[in-house]
């Protein structure tokens, strides 16, 4: 039954009558007028309903802006809007507003003036159905309300000068009518002697320049000296003597190129960043004339450039005007205590106790006086906002000038001389990242082991790279396992990166371990339970190995797989051979030349150690096999090829042995 939907005009009217506006926003008012004109009678009804809500607002600014918007609609939206202004709801709202004691005086005066103008405008339409506004006007006039005429528009300088000239002319005419100059005593002589006529003409010609006190005796003497009878007749009216008095000097025209303040004669809306927006009549303070067509100025608290053709020059204020403005400003600041007193008085009124504003007439007086200050306060706010923007602009220019002065005074900064051959350190994030990966992601970092000897069967064979979980779970196996079981535990080795063998040498004064590549359990790498030594810079990133624990054996019997008799027995059972005596090593079948012991990857870690240790390690690793024959290429010159345990012990004498 009752619609709760909000009108589309509510937001527009609220925005156009905002209480925080310093003055009427004519652009928004015109937008509302355009919308009402396009919507017709329905739009007019909704707009007047929204304005009626704003009239009930207690803020005087909102009420004044609502009345101004209603007047704009009445002047631009035609008969549909005038019919809504003559409705019972709108006229009742105006009647309550005018007769309310709490309504401020400026609002009441503006409402009365608009009621009179609207009643006259509606009467001119000749529609008898629009008579409510006229009835309201008659009722208010019967109550002795004063209907002030709208304030006249300020006249231009040309009109003021013309009006002043006319007033001066009328004043001179009135003075000339009052001053006859004694010419009423002169008589007219139609005929007479030439001398008489000439003397009479002379007297008539000279009479205007003779004062009145001297003209009367002179006329009497002439009348007595004449013997001929004089005929009295027509006495001429005194002629109008116009002696124009000098007018007040016209104020000199102000040059636009020297004026400090200009006034906008057209509205301007900036299209680019930095352009200053203003309305017609705004006063702009000129700050800079850097360009011919565009100047920089301050207006409404903003600084920007504006076109010169949109403004006119304003004369400089006189000392009297400056004094009046200073006195008015002082009165405004002196009245601020009145506003504080009003607030304190309003805080002491409690409606819960039954207090009413009607019981305190002093509150109404203070309120009306405070409302009268609002326009002056808005003017001062605009004035000081412009000064603030100007000071900020001046401060920015000063800081820029100070920086340039210091730069020119001190000169450019001197470059500090560096010693000869100095190269600043360069950050190597990629190298550090690769080093961090070499400690953590070693399975993905394949390395190429340098081969000190040219070995026929192993020259093209890639060394296996096991995953970390395989290193942790793999158990030592005997040297004599089948090729299938050995290759099943290996994984494909990715493409290897060739490295410089010199990079494998550790830095000086750093501890390192070097173990010869041996198939025995003598030169075992320390157990995985001990702390892993950090790899030196440039070393291959092999994962830590977990070799079996070294078992104590008798000297001379520390051959391949010594101490693991069960594994050797299993090996001989698979190949159908008889186990030899403990002093001899079994010969490895020729059908498996490619098989290697499980400890072979451990022997490849010789790249951690110096070059001479690598040579000894590879010699010890490939010099002997269980059958005592050479398994790889011949040894280096100057070395002997041992057989069995003797060969192993001979190799052990030439390298350092570290206990685990």
Swiss-Prot record:
Q: Which PROSITE patterns match?
A: SH3, UIM, VHS
Q: Which domain of life is it from?
A: Eukaryota
- Localization annotation: Endosome membrane
| Composition skew (Basic and acidic residues), residue ranges | 158-182
The protein's predominant localisation is membrane
Map out region (Disordered) in residue numbers: 146-254, 437-660
Keyword Membrane part of the UniProt annotation: yes
Domain SH3: start-end pairs = 257-316
- Keyword terms of this UniProt record: Endosome, Membrane, Protein transport, SH3 domain, Transport
Q: For the VHS domain, which residue ranges apply?
A: 16-148
Which Gene3D superfamilies does the annotation name?
1.20.5.1940, 1.25.40.90, SH3 Domains
- One annotated GO molecular function: phosphatidylinositol binding
State the annotated membrane topology for this chain. Peripheral membrane protein
Q: Which SMART domains match?
A: SH3, VHS
Q: Which ranges are annotated Low complexity under compositional bias?
A: 190-230, 437-503, 573-623, 638-651
GO BP field: protein transport to vacuole involved in ubiquitin-dependent protein catabolic process via the multivesicular body sorting pathway
**Which spans does this entry mark as compositional bias, Polar residues?**
517-533
**Signal as a keyword?**
no
Gene Ontology terms: cellular component: endosome membrane; ESCRT-0 complex
The UniProt record lists the UIM domain at 164-183
Subunit: Component of the ESCRT-0 complex composed of HSE1 and VPS27.
Family designation: Belongs to the STAM family.
Instruction: List, alphabetically, the PANTHER family matched.
Output: JAK PATHWAY SIGNAL TRANSDUCTION ADAPTOR MOLECULE (PTHR45929:SF3)
What is the role of the protein in this entry? Component of the ESCRT-0 complex which is the sorting receptor for ubiquitinated cargo proteins at the multivesicular body (MVB).
Q: What is this protein called?
A: Class E vacuolar protein-sorting machinery protein HSE1
- Gene source species: Cryptococcus neoformans var. neoformans serotype D (strain B-3501A) (Filobasidiella neoformans)
Supply the source organism's classification.
Answer: Eukaryota, Fungi, Dikarya, Basidiomycota, Agaricomycotina
């Amino acid at each position: 039954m009752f619609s709760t939907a909000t009108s589309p005009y509510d937001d527009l009217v609220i925005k156009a009558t905002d209480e925080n506006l310093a003055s009427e926003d004519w652009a928004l008012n015109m937008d509302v007028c355009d919308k009402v004109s396009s919507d017709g009678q329905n739009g007019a009804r909704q707009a007047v309903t929204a304005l009626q809500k704003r009239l009930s607002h207690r803020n005087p600014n909102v009420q004044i802006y609502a009345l101004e918007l209603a007047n704009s609609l009445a002047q631009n939206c035609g008969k549909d809007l005038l019919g809504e202004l003559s409705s019972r709801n709108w006229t009742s709202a105006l009647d309550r507003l005018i007769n309310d004691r709490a309504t401020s005086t400026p609002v009441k005066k503006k409402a009365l003036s608009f009621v009179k103008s609207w009643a006259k405008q509606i009467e001119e339409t000749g529609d008898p159905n629009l008579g409510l506004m006229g009835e309201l006007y008659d009722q208010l006039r019967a109550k002795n309300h004063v209907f002030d005429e709208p304030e006249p528009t300020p006249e231009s300088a040309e009109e003021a000068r013309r009006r002043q000239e006319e007033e001066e002319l009328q004043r001179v005419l009135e003075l000339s009518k009052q001053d006859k100059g004694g010419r009423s005593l002169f008589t007219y002589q139609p005929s007479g002697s030439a001398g008489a006529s000439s003397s009479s003409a002379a007297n008539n010609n000279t009479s205007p320049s003779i004062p009145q006190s001297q003209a009367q005796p002179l006329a009497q003497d002439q009348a007595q000296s004449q013997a001929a009878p004089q005929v009295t007749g027509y006495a001429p009216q005194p002629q109008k003597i116009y002696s124009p008095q000098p007018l007040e000097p016209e104020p000199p025209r102000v040059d636009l190129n020297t004026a400090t303040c200009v006034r906008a004669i057209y509205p301007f809306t900036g299209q680019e960043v930095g352009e200053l927006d203003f309305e017609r009549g705004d006063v702009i303070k000129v700050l800079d004339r850097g360009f011919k067509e565009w100047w920089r100025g301050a207006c409404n608290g903003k600084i920007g450039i504006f076109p010169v053709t949109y403004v006119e020059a304003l004369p400089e204020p006189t000392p009297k005007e400056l004094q009046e403005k200073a006195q008015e400003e002082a009165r405004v600041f002196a009245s601020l205590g009145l506003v504080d007193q009003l607030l304190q008085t309003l805080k002491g009124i409690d409606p819960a106790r039954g207090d009413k504003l009607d019981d305190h007439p002093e509150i109404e007086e203070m309120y009306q006086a405070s409302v009268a200050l609002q326009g002056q306060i808005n003017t001062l706010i605009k004035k000081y906002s412009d000064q603030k923007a100007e000071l900020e602009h001046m401060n920015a220019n000063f800081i820029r000038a100070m920086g340039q002065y210091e730069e020119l005074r001190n000169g450019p900064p001197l470059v500090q001389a560096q010693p000869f051959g100095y190269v600043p350190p360069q950050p190597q994030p990629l190298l550090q990242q690769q080093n961090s990966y070499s400690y953590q992601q070693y399975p993905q970092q394949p390395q190429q082991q340098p081969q000190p000897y040219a070995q026929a069967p192993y020259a093209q064979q890639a060394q296996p790279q096991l995953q970390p979980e395989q290193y942790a779970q793999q158990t030592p196996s005997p040297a004599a396992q089948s090729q299938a079981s050995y290759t099943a535990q290996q994984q494909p080795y990715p493409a290897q990166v060739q490295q410089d063998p010199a990079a494998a040498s550790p830095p000086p004064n750093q501890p390192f371990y070097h173990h010869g590549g041996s198939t025995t359990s003598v030169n075992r790498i320390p157990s995985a339970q001990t702390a892993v030594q950090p790899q030196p810079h440039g070393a291959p990133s092999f994962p830590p190995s977990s070799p079996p624990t070294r078992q104590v054996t008798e000297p001379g019997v520390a051959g391949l797989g010594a101490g693991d008799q069960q594994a050797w027995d299993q090996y001989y059972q698979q190949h159908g051979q008889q186990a030899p005596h403990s002093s001899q090593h079994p010969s490895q079948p020729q059908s498996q030349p490619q098989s290697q012991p499980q400890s072979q990857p451990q022997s490849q870690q010789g790249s951690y150690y110096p070059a001479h240790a690598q040579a000894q390690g590879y010699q010890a690793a490939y010099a002997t096999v269980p059958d005592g024959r050479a398994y790889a290429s011949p040894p280096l010159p100057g070395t002997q090829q041992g057989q069995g345990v003797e060969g192993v012990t001979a190799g052990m004498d030439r390298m350092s042995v570290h206990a685990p």
